[in-house]
Structure formats: C-alpha cells, structure tokens
Amino acid sequence: MELTPREKDKLLLFTAGLVAERRRARGLKLNYPEAIALISCEIMEGARDGRTVAELMSYGRTILTAEDVMEGVPEMITDIQVECTFPDGTKLVSIHDPIV
C-alpha cells in the first residue's frame, strides 16, 4: 500500500487518537500528546460526518475537560489547528482553549 506523507500523518494521528481514547476509557488522565491526538481525531471524524467548521470549532471545546488530563496540560494547549477534508474541499479548523 502506497501512502502519501499527508496520509501517513493522518494515519499516525488516528492511531494516537485510538490509544488516547482507550486510556481515557480506562480512567487514565491523558498527557499532552494524547489530548492533542484525541481532540484532533474527533474533529477529523466530525468533518467526515458532514459537520460544519463552526460546529466543529464549538464541539472541539467540549471533548475534554481539565479532569480528563494530567495537571498542567490545559495551560499547555492554547490552540489546536486541524486540517480536515470536507465535501467542498480542505479547510483548517481552529479550536481556541480546547480544554476548560
């Protein structure tokens, strides 16, 4: 199977998101990379499901709370930007202060 660098990046991010999802389900607090991966995956999947950029920007702030992550992680993540493929093209979804 031949993958472009972009496809490899998406696959790696999705894999990290699955690991984060499983750890969260076991009750573990997520670290910085896991939190980024989980939020990014949820946003990419939302785009695939047909949600709008505005909906995803709002939804991105509800995925994780400070209780879901290790101490200090919310302060480290001020912005997340995810490039998503929508039916009308590729767009950048920005989530400001995603963990409250």
Swiss-Prot record:
Location(s) in or outside the cell: Cytoplasm
Disulfide bonds: none
Record flagged with keyword Transmembrane helix: no
Molecular function per GO: nickel cation binding; urease activity
Top-level taxonomic group: Bacteria
Enzyme Commission (EC) number: 3.5.1.5
InterPro entries hit by this protein: Urease_gamma (IPR012010), Urease_gamma/gamma-beta_su (IPR002026), Urease_gamma_sf (IPR036463), Urease_subunit (IPR050069)
Gene3D superfamilies hit by this protein: Urease, gamma-like subunit (3.30.280.10)
Pathway assigned to this chain's UniProt record: Nitrogen metabolism; urea degradation; CO(2) and NH(3) from urea (urease route): step 1/1
One cellular-component annotation, GO: cytoplasm
Catalytic reaction(s) noted: urea + 2 H2O + H(+) = hydrogencarbonate + 2 NH4(+)
One Pfam family this sequence matches: Urease_gamma
Classification via CDD domains: Urease_gamma
One of the protein's GO biological processes: urea catabolic process
Induction: By urea.
Keywords attached to this entry: Cytoplasm, Hydrolase
SUPFAM superfamilies: Urease, gamma-subunit
Family of the protein in this entry: Belongs to the urease gamma subunit family.
PANTHER family in the record: UREASE
Protein name: Urease subunit gamma
Organism: Vibrio parahaemolyticus
Lineage of the species this protein comes from: Bacteria, Pseudomonadati, Pseudomonadota, Gammaproteobacteria, Vibrionales
Name of the encoding gene: ureA
